[in-house]
Regions:
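Beta-sandwich interaction modules
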Residues: 46-69, 74-75
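Short, surface-exposed beta-strand/strand-loop-strand elements in extracellular ectodomains
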Residues: 16-36
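Acidic/proline-rich low-complexity IDRs
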Residues: 23-25, 42, 56
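A detector of low-complexity, intrinsically disordered, Ser/Thr/Gly/Pro/Ala-rich segments
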Residues: 26, 31, 51-53, 88
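Solvent-exposed serine/threonine-rich low-complexity stretches and specific carbohydrate-binding patches
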Residues: 36-47
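C-terminal interaction-tip segments
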Residues: 1-8, 14-19, 65-67, 73-93
């Protein structure tokens, strides 16, 4: 199996749908509080806007275990419009 290392994650809301919070973490827990050590970020997505994690340098971003999932979850009411989620990462052996 491979490990992923997060470089940057961006969430884009192209239509008016209210402010949203999106949590990003490693693992398959129900939410970011399942294992706080695996938390990456909570993004505050403005109405009709976008937000991103900070950009990590190569070999410095959060790194998952072998075959570990990268998970994201909406906090509160999920959006009713389409959102784009762009994940930039590298794979490591």
């Amino acid at each position: 199996g491979r490990r992923i290392r997060v470089l940057r994650v961006q969430v884009i809301q192209e239509q008016t749908d209210g402010r949203r919070l999106w949590e990003l973490y490693l693992g398959t827990g129900a939410d970011i509080t399942t294992d706080p050590a695996k938390a990456i970020d909570i993004l505050d997505i403005p109405n009709d806007g976008e937000a991103a994690t900070r950009t990590f340098l190569r070999d410095e971003g959060p790194r998952g275990e072998r075959d570990e999932a990268l998970s994201g979850r909406w906090l509160g009411t999920p959006p009713t419009t389409v959102h784009k989620i762009i994940v930039e990462y590298t794979e490591e052996s």
